[in-house]
Protein backbone atom coordinates (compact mmCIF):
# COMPACT_ATOMS: atom_id res chain seq x y z
CA UNK A 1 0.00 0.00 0.00
CA UNK A 2 2.78 2.40 0.93
CA UNK A 3 4.56 1.60 -2.30
CA UNK A 4 1.40 2.22 -4.32
CA UNK A 5 0.83 5.51 -2.50
CA UNK A 6 4.38 6.63 -3.30
CA UNK A 7 3.86 5.84 -6.98
CA UNK A 8 0.59 7.76 -7.07
CA UNK A 9 2.20 10.78 -5.40
CA UNK A 10 5.04 10.64 -7.90
CA UNK A 11 2.65 10.45 -10.83
CA UNK A 12 0.63 13.36 -9.47
CA UNK A 13 3.79 15.43 -9.14
CA UNK A 14 4.77 14.68 -12.74
CA UNK A 15 1.30 15.54 -13.97
CA UNK A 16 1.33 18.88 -12.15
CA UNK A 17 4.77 19.71 -13.49
CA UNK A 18 3.70 18.82 -17.02
CA UNK A 19 0.50 20.86 -16.75
CA UNK A 20 2.58 23.88 -15.72
CA UNK A 21 4.92 23.55 -18.71
CA UNK A 22 4.79 26.44 -21.16
CA UNK A 23 6.71 26.02 -24.40
CA UNK A 24 7.57 29.26 -26.20
CA UNK A 25 8.81 28.93 -29.79
CA UNK A 26 9.49 31.40 -32.58
CA UNK A 27 11.09 34.80 -33.08
CA UNK A 28 14.85 34.90 -32.56
CA UNK A 29 14.52 38.67 -32.09
CA UNK A 30 12.28 38.09 -29.08
CA UNK A 31 14.16 35.08 -27.75
CA UNK A 32 16.42 37.13 -25.48
CA UNK A 33 13.43 38.82 -23.83
CA UNK A 34 11.39 35.62 -23.54
CA UNK A 35 14.29 33.69 -22.01
CA UNK A 36 15.09 36.32 -19.40
CA UNK A 37 11.43 36.91 -18.54
CA UNK A 38 10.96 33.15 -18.23
CA UNK A 39 13.92 32.87 -15.87
CA UNK A 40 12.65 35.74 -13.73
CA UNK A 41 9.12 34.32 -13.71
CA UNK A 42 10.36 30.99 -12.38
CA UNK A 43 11.87 32.72 -9.36
CA UNK A 44 8.44 33.86 -8.20
CA UNK A 45 6.60 30.82 -9.61
CA UNK A 46 8.85 27.86 -8.71
CA UNK A 47 6.26 25.34 -9.91
CA UNK A 48 6.34 26.76 -13.44
CA UNK A 49 8.29 25.19 -16.29
CA UNK A 50 8.94 27.60 -19.15
CA UNK A 51 10.94 26.40 -22.15
CA UNK A 52 12.00 29.01 -24.73
CA UNK A 53 13.26 28.15 -28.20
CA UNK A 54 13.99 30.12 -31.37
CA UNK A 55 13.36 28.85 -34.88
CA UNK A 56 11.96 32.03 -36.42
CA UNK A 57 8.57 33.71 -36.53
CA UNK A 58 7.24 31.35 -39.20
CA UNK A 59 8.01 28.36 -37.02
CA UNK A 60 6.42 29.99 -33.99
CA UNK A 61 3.19 30.72 -35.86
CA UNK A 62 2.91 27.30 -37.47
CA UNK A 63 3.69 25.50 -34.21
CA UNK A 64 1.15 27.40 -32.13
CA UNK A 65 -1.49 27.03 -34.84
CA UNK A 66 -0.91 23.26 -34.81
CA UNK A 67 -1.29 23.19 -31.03
CA UNK A 68 2.25 21.86 -30.64
CA UNK A 69 3.28 24.70 -28.31
CA UNK A 70 1.48 26.98 -25.89
CA UNK A 71 3.01 30.22 -27.20
CA UNK A 72 4.28 31.20 -30.62
CA UNK A 73 6.35 34.39 -30.80
CA UNK A 74 6.57 36.46 -33.96
CA UNK A 75 7.95 39.73 -35.32
CA UNK A 76 5.17 39.86 -37.90
CA UNK A 77 1.38 39.84 -37.84
CA UNK A 78 -0.06 36.34 -38.26
CA UNK A 79 -2.40 37.51 -41.03
CA UNK A 80 0.58 38.31 -43.27
CA UNK A 81 1.83 34.71 -43.28
CA UNK A 82 0.68 32.10 -45.81
CA UNK A 83 -0.91 29.03 -44.26
CA UNK A 84 -1.73 30.78 -40.98
CA UNK A 85 -5.36 31.33 -39.99
CA UNK A 86 -5.01 34.45 -37.85
CA UNK A 87 -8.65 34.27 -36.79
CA UNK A 88 -7.88 31.17 -34.74
CA UNK A 89 -4.99 32.83 -32.92
CA UNK A 90 -5.02 35.41 -30.16
CA UNK A 91 -2.48 38.23 -30.47
CA UNK A 92 -0.73 39.89 -27.53
CA UNK A 93 1.66 42.79 -28.29
CA UNK A 94 4.53 42.55 -25.82
CA UNK A 95 7.18 45.01 -27.03
CA UNK A 96 8.74 46.75 -30.02
CA UNK A 97 12.18 46.00 -31.41
CA UNK A 98 14.30 48.05 -33.77
CA UNK A 99 16.15 46.48 -36.70
CA UNK A 100 19.49 47.84 -37.87
CA UNK A 101 21.71 47.14 -40.90
CA UNK A 102 25.22 46.16 -39.81
CA UNK A 103 28.48 45.93 -41.75
CA UNK A 104 31.98 44.76 -41.06
CA UNK A 105 34.02 47.80 -40.06
CA UNK A 106 36.44 47.24 -42.93
CA UNK A 107 33.76 48.44 -45.39
CA UNK A 108 34.43 52.06 -44.42
CA UNK A 109 30.79 53.22 -44.38
CA UNK A 110 28.52 54.33 -41.56
CA UNK A 111 25.53 55.72 -43.48
CA UNK A 112 23.52 54.61 -46.49
CA UNK A 113 20.42 55.94 -48.17
CA UNK A 114 17.40 53.67 -48.18
CA UNK A 115 17.81 53.34 -51.96
CA UNK A 116 21.46 52.29 -51.60
CA UNK A 117 20.46 49.73 -48.99
CA UNK A 118 17.81 48.34 -51.32
CA UNK A 119 20.27 48.24 -54.22
CA UNK A 120 22.77 46.27 -52.13
CA UNK A 121 20.23 43.66 -51.06
CA UNK A 122 18.92 43.30 -54.63
CA UNK A 123 22.40 42.99 -56.14
CA UNK A 124 22.61 46.30 -58.00
CA UNK A 125 25.45 47.60 -55.84
CA UNK A 126 28.23 45.06 -55.39
CA UNK A 127 31.27 47.00 -54.13
CA UNK A 128 31.61 49.29 -51.12
CA UNK A 129 33.42 51.91 -53.22
CA UNK A 130 30.10 52.52 -55.03
CA UNK A 131 28.70 54.00 -51.80
CA UNK A 132 31.82 55.84 -50.62
CA UNK A 133 33.56 52.96 -48.90
CA UNK A 134 36.63 50.88 -49.65
CA UNK A 135 37.29 48.99 -52.87
CA UNK A 136 35.90 45.80 -51.43
CA UNK A 137 33.33 43.28 -52.68
CA UNK A 138 30.04 43.32 -50.78
CA UNK A 139 28.92 40.01 -49.29
CA UNK A 140 25.26 39.93 -48.27
CA UNK A 141 24.19 37.76 -45.35
CA UNK A 142 20.43 37.35 -45.37
CA UNK A 143 18.08 35.91 -42.78
CA UNK A 144 16.23 32.64 -43.32
CA UNK A 145 12.92 32.71 -45.18
CA UNK A 146 10.90 32.05 -42.01
CA UNK A 147 12.45 35.01 -40.23
CA UNK A 148 10.10 37.77 -39.13
CA UNK A 149 13.06 40.15 -39.08
CA UNK A 150 13.64 39.37 -42.76
CA UNK A 151 9.96 39.88 -43.53
CA UNK A 152 10.01 43.28 -41.86
CA UNK A 153 13.28 44.35 -43.49
CA UNK A 154 12.26 43.33 -47.00
CA UNK A 155 8.79 44.82 -46.61
CA UNK A 156 10.14 48.20 -45.53
CA UNK A 157 13.36 48.38 -47.58
CA UNK A 158 12.97 46.30 -50.74
CA UNK A 159 9.34 47.27 -51.45
CA UNK A 160 8.53 44.02 -53.23
CA UNK A 161 11.81 43.70 -55.13
CA UNK A 162 13.46 40.28 -55.24
CA UNK A 163 16.45 39.95 -52.87
CA UNK A 164 19.80 38.74 -54.13
CA UNK A 165 20.60 35.07 -53.58
CA UNK A 166 22.84 34.96 -50.54
CA UNK A 167 23.94 32.95 -47.55
CA UNK A 168 21.08 32.70 -45.05
CA UNK A 169 21.31 32.50 -41.27
CA UNK A 170 18.63 31.86 -38.66
CA UNK A 171 19.77 33.74 -35.59
CA UNK A 172 20.77 37.30 -34.70
CA UNK A 173 23.78 36.03 -32.76
CA UNK A 174 25.15 34.03 -35.68
CA UNK A 175 24.69 36.94 -38.08
CA UNK A 176 26.47 39.31 -35.71
CA UNK A 177 29.39 36.89 -35.35
CA UNK A 178 29.79 36.43 -39.11
CA UNK A 179 29.62 40.15 -39.89
CA UNK A 180 32.04 41.09 -37.12
CA UNK A 181 34.66 38.63 -38.38
CA UNK A 182 34.20 38.70 -42.17
CA UNK A 183 35.41 41.71 -44.23
CA UNK A 184 32.91 43.10 -46.74
CA UNK A 185 29.81 41.61 -45.15
CA UNK A 186 26.46 43.30 -44.54
CA UNK A 187 23.30 42.07 -42.86
CA UNK A 188 20.69 43.27 -40.36
CA UNK A 189 19.84 42.33 -36.79
CA UNK A 190 17.60 43.41 -33.94
CA UNK A 191 18.74 46.25 -31.66
CA UNK A 192 19.25 44.07 -28.55
CA UNK A 193 21.91 42.06 -30.40
CA UNK A 194 23.70 45.05 -31.96
CA UNK A 195 25.99 45.68 -28.99
CA UNK A 196 29.23 44.39 -30.47
CA UNK A 197 31.95 47.01 -30.93
CA UNK A 198 33.36 44.96 -33.80
CA UNK A 199 30.39 45.75 -36.05
CA UNK A 200 29.34 49.04 -37.62
CA UNK A 201 25.68 49.96 -37.20
CA UNK A 202 24.48 51.94 -40.20
CA UNK A 203 22.45 55.12 -40.17
CA UNK A 204 19.86 55.39 -42.96
CA UNK A 205 19.51 58.74 -44.74
CA UNK A 206 21.40 60.33 -41.85
CA UNK A 207 19.00 59.03 -39.19
CA UNK A 208 20.62 57.07 -36.37
CA UNK A 209 19.28 53.70 -35.20
CA UNK A 210 18.12 54.63 -31.69
CA UNK A 211 15.13 53.62 -29.60
CA UNK A 212 14.07 57.25 -29.43
CA UNK A 213 13.91 57.45 -33.22
CA UNK A 214 11.92 54.20 -33.31
CA UNK A 215 9.38 55.59 -30.85
CA UNK A 216 8.54 58.46 -33.24
CA UNK A 217 8.95 56.35 -36.41
CA UNK A 218 11.84 58.53 -37.64
CA UNK A 219 13.63 55.18 -37.78
CA UNK A 220 11.25 53.07 -39.86
CA UNK A 221 12.89 49.68 -39.35
CA UNK A 222 11.05 48.22 -36.38
CA UNK A 223 8.50 45.58 -35.60
CA UNK A 224 6.17 44.51 -32.84
CA UNK A 225 7.04 41.52 -30.72
CA UNK A 226 3.91 39.36 -30.72
CA UNK A 227 2.88 36.54 -28.43
CA UNK A 228 0.31 34.31 -30.12
CA UNK A 229 -1.83 31.64 -28.49
CA UNK A 230 -4.26 29.24 -30.13
CA UNK A 231 -7.52 30.79 -29.03
CA UNK A 232 -7.92 31.80 -25.41
CA UNK A 233 -4.88 30.75 -23.36
CA UNK A 234 -5.24 28.49 -20.33
CA UNK A 235 -4.84 29.91 -16.84
CA UNK A 236 -1.11 29.21 -16.51
CA UNK A 237 -0.28 30.66 -19.92
CA UNK A 238 -2.41 33.73 -19.22
CA UNK A 239 -0.53 34.31 -15.96
CA UNK A 240 2.78 34.31 -17.83
CA UNK A 241 1.42 36.65 -20.51
CA UNK A 242 0.13 38.99 -17.79
CA UNK A 243 3.62 38.92 -16.28
CA UNK A 244 5.17 39.82 -19.65
CA UNK A 245 2.77 42.77 -19.94
CA UNK A 246 3.25 43.84 -16.32
CA UNK A 247 5.30 46.75 -15.02
CA UNK A 248 8.33 44.70 -13.94
CA UNK A 249 8.97 43.44 -17.46
CA UNK A 250 7.75 46.52 -19.35
CA UNK A 251 9.49 49.14 -17.20
CA UNK A 252 12.65 47.26 -16.25
CA UNK A 253 13.50 44.23 -18.37
CA UNK A 254 12.31 45.52 -21.76
CA UNK A 255 14.52 48.66 -21.80
CA UNK A 256 17.38 46.88 -20.03
CA UNK A 257 17.65 44.38 -22.88
CA UNK A 258 17.30 47.00 -25.63
CA UNK A 259 13.63 46.56 -26.53
CA UNK A 260 10.96 49.27 -26.39
CA UNK A 261 7.80 49.15 -24.30
CA UNK A 262 4.54 49.40 -26.25
CA UNK A 263 3.62 52.31 -23.96
CA UNK A 264 6.63 54.32 -25.19
CA UNK A 265 5.55 54.24 -28.83
CA UNK A 266 4.07 57.45 -30.21
CA UNK A 267 2.81 55.65 -33.32
CA UNK A 268 0.97 52.47 -34.23
CA UNK A 269 1.55 50.21 -37.23
CA UNK A 270 -0.93 47.74 -38.72
CA UNK A 271 -0.36 44.52 -40.63
CA UNK A 272 -0.17 46.47 -43.92
CA UNK A 273 2.67 48.64 -42.55
CA UNK A 274 0.42 51.70 -42.31
CA UNK A 275 1.62 53.95 -39.50
CA UNK A 276 -0.58 56.42 -37.61
CA UNK A 277 0.01 58.66 -34.61
CA UNK A 278 -1.39 57.39 -31.33
Label the predicted regions.
Residues 9-13:
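C-terminal motif of bacterial Sec signal peptides marking the signal peptidase cleavage site
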Amino acid sequence: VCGLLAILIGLTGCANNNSNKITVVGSSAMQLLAEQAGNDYRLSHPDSNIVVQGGGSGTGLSQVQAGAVEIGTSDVFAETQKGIDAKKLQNHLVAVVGIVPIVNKSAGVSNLSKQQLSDIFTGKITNWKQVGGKNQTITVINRSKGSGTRGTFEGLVLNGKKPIQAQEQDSNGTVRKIVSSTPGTISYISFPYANDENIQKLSIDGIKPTNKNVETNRWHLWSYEHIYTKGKPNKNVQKFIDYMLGSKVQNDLVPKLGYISIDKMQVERDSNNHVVQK
